[in-house]
């Protein structure tokens, strides 16, 4: 509340009115980083999960000039699915993995889809509608072993499972 009513300076500016908001943002960045095993400078603030997913998926695709493939699941959050549809329209092929009957994507399942042409794998950590929690560390290792980047939407996992981005490999 104080940053809406009294200390509303632009935290990105060098003037004195911006000092308190800038300090608050830095403290928030440090707090979040410590919760997920990241460095403060690795934390970026967006308007929410949808914008973050778009930054990750589309940003990677825009630098993927040779249009290599992306793999995701058929049961991702719509933010991821819509971002994948957008990159498909740009000529980037996307494969949609189907889960097993427990709504689970195994390492073996990803191994069946991934090739050395895969550029990005995106799998939601915890699905808020289905209740499934994916083995992100294992899936990330498969992606990295094939030279692919790995993205996970972990918004629904926060507070339910321990998250350490370095341990997970994301």
What are these regions (language model features)?
Residues 1-170:
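Pyridoxal 5′-phosphate
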């Amino acid at each position: 509340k104080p940053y809406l009513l009294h200390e509303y300076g632009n935290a990105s500016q060098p003037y004195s009115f911006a000092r308190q908001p800038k300090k608050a943002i830095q403290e928030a960045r440090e707090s979040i980083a410590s919760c997920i095993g990241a460095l403060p400078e690795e934390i970026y603030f967006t308007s929410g999960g949808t914008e973050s997913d778009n930054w990750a998926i589309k940003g990677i695709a825009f630098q993927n000039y040779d249009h290599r493939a992306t793999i995701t699941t058929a049961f991702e959050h719509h933010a991821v699915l819509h971002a994948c549809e957008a990159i498909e329209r740009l000529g980037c092929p996307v494969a949609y993995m189907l889960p097993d009957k427990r709504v689970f994507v195994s390492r073996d399942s990803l191994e069946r889809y991934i090739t050395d042409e895969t550029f990005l794998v995106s799998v939601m950590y915890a699905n808020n509608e289905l209740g499934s929690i994916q083995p992100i560390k294992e899936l990330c290792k498969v992606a990295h072993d094939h030279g692919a980047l790995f993205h996970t939407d972990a918004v629904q996992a926060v507070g339910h499972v321990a998250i350490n981005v370095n341990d997970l490999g994301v």
